[in-house]
Amino acid sequence: MDYQTFEKVNKFINVKAYIFFLTQELKQQYKLSLKELLILAYFYYKNEHSISLKEIIGDILYKQSDVVKNIKSLSKKGFINKSRNEADERRIFVSVTPIQRKKIACVINELDKIIKGFNKERDYIKYQWAPKYSKEFFILFMNIMYSKDFLKYRFNLTFLDLSILYVISSRKNEILNLKDLFESIRFMYPQIVRSVNRLNNKGMLIKERSLADERIVLIKINKIQYNTIKSIFTDTSKILKPRKFFF
């Protein structure tokens, strides 16, 4: 497999892991979800008083129901205001007052500090892709979400599926077991088992019991499966390039 293709997929996996662990850190600091923080960052960096709901949905690229749900939550928490256009009640606008803007700025400034501390503590500062502040983080986050959607709709694969295929293909001459995957992938054991079963049913890997000990599940791939994985990685690597969003 082409080295650059393999490295791009590896970077994608590392970035997704970074976002997962930073999100866990943020949950301890805020009573806000990552999607709520994204909307606050949207208003902070757009620096506009009032924006239509339609424009927000188009910029953030989330499902309308998700955006509406999080805007409603932020409105209840006093971060933003939601109103209908007097001339056309079907049009919804979201606005922030000067006081709310200061409140949002405090959240974003604190988020910048958390990201900086997290990178230093987890030694992420050595990676060029690691975001230095919230704007870079949300650009990274939205790119990852775009890539995950690509995997889902193009190949019917989850991020965990891709991670397992990466580990197996990087050690294609070995016969691995579930423990090997658990030690290599930052997911819970039951999740890995379900993903392996799904990939086995799709014919993308071979799962079998060890003859020496039937409690041990062995995992391997053949040449045809390796070529299929190679093709998936090649297509995935082509869309793993930074995209411009609303920032």
Swiss-Prot record:
Citing just one GO molecular function, the answer is: DNA binding
Principal location class: cytoplasm
> Where does the UniProt annotation locate this protein?
Cytoplasm
Q: Which InterPro entries does the entry mention?
A: MarR/SlyA-like (IPR039422), SarA/Rot_dom (IPR010166), Transc_reg_Sar_Rot_HTH (IPR055166), WH-like_DNA-bd_sf (IPR036388), WH_DNA-bd_sf (IPR036390)
Q: What does the similarity note say?
A: Belongs to the SarA family.
Q: Name one GO biological process term.
A: response to stress
Source organism's superkingdom? Bacteria
UniProt KW keywords? Activator, Cytoplasm, DNA-binding, Repeat, Transcription, Transcription regulation, Virulence
This protein is called: HTH-type transcriptional regulator SarU
What gene name is listed for this protein?
Answer: sarU
Its biological purpose is as follows: Positive regulator of RNAII and RNAIII in a cell density-dependent manner. It can contribute to the expression of virulence genes controlled by agr. May also regulate target genes via an agr-independent pathway.
| UniProt xrefs under NCBIfam families | Staph_reg_Sar
A single GO CC term, please? cytoplasm
Which organism does this sequence originate in? Staphylococcus aureus (strain COL)
- Residue ranges of the DNA-binding region? 53-76, 178-201
